[in-house]
Structures are given as structure tokens and as C-alpha cells.
Amino acid sequence: MAIILGIDPGSRVTGYGVIRQAGRHLEYLGSGVIRTSVTDLPTRLKRIYMGVNEIILQYQPDMFAIEEVFLAKNANSALKLGQARGAAIVAAVNHDLPVFEYAARLVKQTVVGIGSADKIQVQDMVTRILTLSEKPQADAADALAIAITHAHSLQHAFHVTNSAQATEKPEKTTALLKARYSRGRFRLKI
């Protein structure tokens, strides 16, 4: 059994989603957004760091999954997004959580079945997969989709290694993934 925290980073709105994986079963634990004001960037980054830190303390996840930076036409936007990711990752690393990164296209492909899916399609599928009574906010749904993608990756790792005990031992799973993928970062791109 593993608790996975998914993060959809943004300099103004950062989504988070927490799920528990037990074998093939996924259980919704919580989701929401960390909103920052329109103040200066360092203050926004501090708010993201502190918000992720609070979420980690509340849910005690075993693993941390985050969306990779995409190539944006606006370099300034890409830099701000990278800084927001960095603030969230530092919070995870300060709690000794293993960090796994996923391309947005892979997340959409995993959850919806189409790498070019829109936010509404992601919301719909996350709602179905986790059997939620209502759709989560768009950024929270994206974060849940990232967590679901990581859970799917773990299931694939279990299948490949044929390890029946791995679902009950997240530290064994983490060691396996770190051994298979460089520096503890799981990177798949479509």
C-alpha cells in the first residue's frame, strides 16, 4: 500500500491530489489547489513551498509525482513554471520523499487514452477512475491524474518484476524504480 502525492505546478495555481494505491485499487484521499496572490515571484514560491509542506504533513505520502516542464513559446512563463516546480520539489525532498516526473502528454495518455486530451476530458476520467461524486477543480484533477499515472507506473513495475509483495512495501518499490531509472527520476515521454 502506498500513498502518492501528485502535483500540477503553476506559479499562480498549483494543484495537488493524494491517492492511496493498494494493488490495483486506487482510493481518493484528497485534492485541491494552492493559490498564490499576484505579489512578487519569491513570495509566490514561498507560498507553494509552504503549501506543499502542509499537504505532506497532513497526508504523509510515500511518493511524490510531479509534471515535467513543457517547452513553452514564452520563455518567461517556462522559467516561472520551473521555479514553481522547484519550490514543490524542495518541499518533497526535505521530507525525504522520492520524486518522480511525468510528461503532460504521458499523463493524458495514461488517464484518458489520448495524449492531446483537454482539461475537461482529464477531469471526467479522473472522476470515473476514482469514483468521485463530483468533478475536482481542473488543476486538482491534473494533479490527481499525475498521481494515477505514477500508480500505473508502479503497477507496471510490479508486473515486470513479478513481485507480489511490492504493493505492501513502498520503500521496496521506490528502490526498484530508482534502480531502473536514473537518479530516482522516472521519465517517460511520448
Swiss-Prot record:
InterPro entries: RNaseH-like_sf, RNaseH_sf, X-over_junc_endoDNase_Mg_BS, X-over_junc_endoDNase_RuvC. GO terms for biological process: DNA recombination; DNA repair. It is an enzyme of class 3 (hydrolase). GO terms for cellular component: cytoplasm; Holliday junction resolvase complex. It catalyses: Endonucleolytic cleavage at a junction such as a reciprocal single-stranded crossover between two homologous DNA duplexes (Holliday junction). It is found in: Cytoplasm. Its cofactor is Mg(2+). Its main location: cytoplasm. The active site is at residues 8, 67, 139. Homodimer which binds Holliday junction (HJ) DNA. The HJ becomes 2-fold symmetrical on binding to RuvC with unstacked arms; it has a different conformation from HJ DNA in complex with RuvA. In the full resolvosome a probable DNA-RuvA(4)-RuvB(12)-RuvC(2) complex forms which resolves the HJ. Belongs to the RuvC family. This is Crossover junction endodeoxyribonuclease RuvC. It comes from Pasteurella multocida (strain Pm70). The lineage of its organism: Bacteria, Pseudomonadati, Pseudomonadota, Gammaproteobacteria, Pasteurellales.
